[in-house]
């Protein structure tokens, strides 16, 4: 008995015992037939599982993967036909995926599978191994990636309970996981409702229904006001004077019908409303270990910029990119490729460069950056933009399209009120979304359930009394 098992043995109740997987199962590896021989795969009828088949797989049992092999492929490789009830355990890339064979099947060399002896339930071993990833990794070795050898797979510890107790433990775990899955489903419904509510808030904002319009307030108070058309005209005239005859008039031609706007609002292009509309580099500068962050579409989040997962470029390359698109606090970024959108207001002084990201430089006299962010997230703008995106396999918004984006422009003081009310309502939504996201798919909670049920089963408690908190 190993030192670990000797220490643990004292914690087990009567009838239980610590052992290893090698004592309760035959440990079987897998293999891959030669892929250059079509006879190994064509019209194969032997299910053949790889670790990729278990990536994202949430069922307990598996009957087949993406590929089948032939009997010739099975016989000519180190793959073996495993009986139904075999517990499959990935031993590399990554370690720790688990499933039970629903029917006879084979695996590639990324598995150490356990063909169990009598007296041990596959489901009991399945749940124990679901919580044994760290134990397995501690026994693994390798430089490029960790791999659990067959010899070390045999050393994996497991507490064995009497058969009836195994059945009770399995039933308790599955009851708790069923409750957890129901809770997760409810949380997903909550998130979907929050998303719809957020869209409704943004639509109400750009429909002029979220706050009293400036036109309404002016009538109520018996005063005049600067409507959006006057505001835009004043700003554009100021730019013309400043440019001294060199001002290039923005394109104001929209394609497709646009909805009617509230009194005092006007349709304008992004190029009219903003000081400038540019984009980041489309090249890929050389990456460095430590340097200036290069922000791409995937780094734009609802609540800011994800600097934790950016690549870095040299200071010299940053200066070169900044000649085209220098980012400053108060600018609005917009993903141009892949998941187009995710508008984000820059709220940091930290220097960074952008790649495949649109850059809207605000003109606070005309358009508040926070209002622009909300408008670019609105269902109205998204519906206008979606059919105009370019590309087939991967959609993208070219710079010209970003400059033409229609903006529902309210009077300037009305923008402030809209932003304040949208932020107030969406701050509550964001708090709920963060809470829901933290719970959905919580691996820690699932691990805690496994640990708690096995702990209570080995201690003075009963597994039937274990509850999710």
Task: Please give the residue ranges for each predicted region.
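Low-complexity, Lys/Gly-biased intrinsically disordered segments
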Residues: 3-9, 15-60, 73-77, 241-244, ...
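Non-catalytic DNA-recognition/assembly elements of restriction-modification systems
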Residues: 2-32, 155, 159, 163-170, ...
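A short glycine-rich beta-alpha junction/loop motif
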Residues: 2-5, 14, 91, 105-112, ...
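Interdomain signal-transducing alpha-helices
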Residues: 125, 133, 166-169, 372, ...
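A short beta-sheet element
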Residues: 50-52, 66-130, 149, 296-297, ...
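Extended, domain-scale alpha-helical bundle/helix-rich regions
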Residues: 190, 197-248, 461-465
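Short, basic/aromatic beta-hairpin or loop at an interaction surface
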Residues: 55-68, 299-313, 347-348
């Amino acid at each position: 008995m190993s030192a670990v098992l000797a220490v643990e043995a004292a914690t087990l109740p009567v009838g239980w015992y610590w052992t290893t997987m090698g004592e309760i199962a035959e440990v079987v590896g897998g293999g891959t037939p030669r892929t250059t021989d079509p006879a190994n795969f064509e019209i194969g009828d032997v299910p053949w599982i790889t670790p990729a088949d278990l990536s994202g797989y949430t069922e307990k049992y598996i009957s087949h993967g993406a590929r089948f092999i032939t009997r010739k492929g099975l016989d000519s490789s180190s793959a073996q036909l495993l009986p139904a009830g075999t517990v499959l355990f990935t031993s590399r890339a990554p370690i720790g995926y688990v499933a039970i064979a629903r029917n006879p099947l084979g695996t590639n060399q990324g598995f150490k599978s356990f063909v169990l002896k009598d007296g041990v339930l596959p489901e009991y071993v399945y749940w124990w191994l679901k919580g044994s990833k760290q134990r397995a990794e501690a026994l693994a070795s390798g430089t490029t990636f960790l791999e659990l050898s067959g010899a070390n797979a045999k050393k994996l510890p497991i507490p064995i309970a009497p058969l009836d107790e195994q059945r009770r433990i399995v039933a308790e775990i599955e009851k708790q996981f069923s409750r957890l899955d129901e809770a997760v489903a409810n949380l997903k419904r909550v998130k979907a409702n929050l998303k719809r509510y957020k869209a409704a808030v943004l639509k109400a904002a750009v429909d002029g229904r979220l706050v009293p319009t400036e036109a309404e307030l002016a009538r109520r108070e018996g005063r005049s006001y600067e409507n959006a058309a006057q505001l835009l005209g004043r700003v554009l005239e100021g730019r013309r004077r400043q440019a001294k005859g060199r001002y290039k008039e923005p394109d104001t031609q929209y394609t497709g019908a646009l909805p009617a706007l509230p009194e005092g609002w006007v349709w304008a292009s992004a190029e009219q409303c903003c000081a400038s509309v540019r984009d980041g580099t489309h090249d890929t500068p050389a990456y460095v270990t430590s340097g200036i962050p290069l922000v791409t579409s995937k780094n734009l989040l609802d609540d800011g910029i994800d600097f934790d997962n950016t690549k870095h470029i040299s200071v010299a390359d940053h200066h070169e990119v900044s000649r085209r698109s220098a980012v400053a606090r108060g600018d609005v970024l917009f993903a141009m490729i892949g998941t187009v959108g995710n508008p984000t207001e820059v709220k940091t002084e930290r220097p960074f460069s952008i790649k495949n990201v649109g850059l809207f430089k605000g003109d606070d006299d005309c358009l508040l950056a926070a209002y622009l962010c909300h408008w670019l997230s609105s269902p109205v703008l998204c519906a206008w933009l979606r059919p105009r995106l370019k590309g087939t396999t991967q959609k993208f918004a070219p710079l010209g399209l970003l400059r033409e984006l229609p903006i529902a422009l309210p009077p300037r003081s009305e923008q402030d009120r809209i932003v304040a009310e949208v932020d107030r309502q969406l701050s509550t939504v964001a708090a709920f979304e963060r809470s829901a996201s933290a719970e959905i798919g919580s691996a820690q909670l699932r691990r805690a359930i496994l640990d708690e049920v096995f702990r209570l089963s080995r201690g003075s408690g009963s597994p039937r009394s274990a509850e999710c908190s």
